[in-house]
Amino acid sequence: MIERPKSRERRDVRIPPLGLAGILQIPQNTHALVVFAHGSGSSRFSPRNTAVAEALNDWGIATLLFDLLTPAEEADRANVFNIPLLADRLADAILWLDGQASVAELPLGLFGASTGAAAALVAAAAHPRRVRAVVSRGGRPDLAGGALEQVEAPTLLIVGGADFGVIELNEQAFARLHGTKALEIVPGASHLFPEPGALEAVIDYAARWFERHLAPTAPERARMAG
């Protein structure tokens, strides 16, 4: 039986070099870390990503939600679809986290929504030794392009059963992934999973995926304990 942490530490942080605003939450006895990549038109305050992050905290997984763009960059609509730029921002966040003693040794995963899913996959392909798992919620993994074939991290694609068009794009991207992978379709759910029980299904799929693939190795457990 998993012992749920009773407390968590919340930090409002700034990710260099641009000072992107973020929220880092570290539960008691944390054993893994997940970085979130929000979709177009969203931010670190995404209510759906926040709900997923809080649930992961209950599983003992630390989370970072942060803005992928500066306010000035958000004014240019083209930037929200600039997947290489968004992936670079994830890389900046990973580099910063690796310098934070409280989370530097934790196995790391990425959770991406919409366009953020493509950015997460590109970042995972570029950092195979650091990124250990990826989850996409209502994502556009097809926008990751050639990076799909390079992803080594176990990848879970979650899509709503009523998210017509996006299902097909996920199925096509799924076929291009070569590593450990799974595709879960939530029956009756649309793109933002507002239907009763839909987001809860996303949370359950994501938490179990990260628990399975972000389990610390024996050397990692020793470093975290030491």
Please tell me what each predicted stretch does:
Residues 4, 11-106, 192-197, 201-202:
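Serine-hydrolase catalytic machinery in alpha/beta-hydrolase-like enzymes
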Residues 129-141:
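A conserved short beta-strand
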Residues 151, 157-159:
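Short beta-strand/loop motif that positions the catalytic acidic residue
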Residues 109-112, 137:
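Short beta-strand immediately N-terminal to the catalytic nucleophile in serine-hydrolase-like folds
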Residues 189-192, 197-226:
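Catalytic active-site module of serine/aspartate enzymes centered on a nucleophile-bearing elbow/loop
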Residues 112-120:
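Gly/Ala-rich beta-loop-alpha elbow adjacent to hydrolase catalytic centers
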Residues 177-192:
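Catalytic histidine neighborhood in serine/cysteine hydrolases
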Residues 164-169:
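Conserved alpha/beta-hydrolase "acid-adjacent" motif
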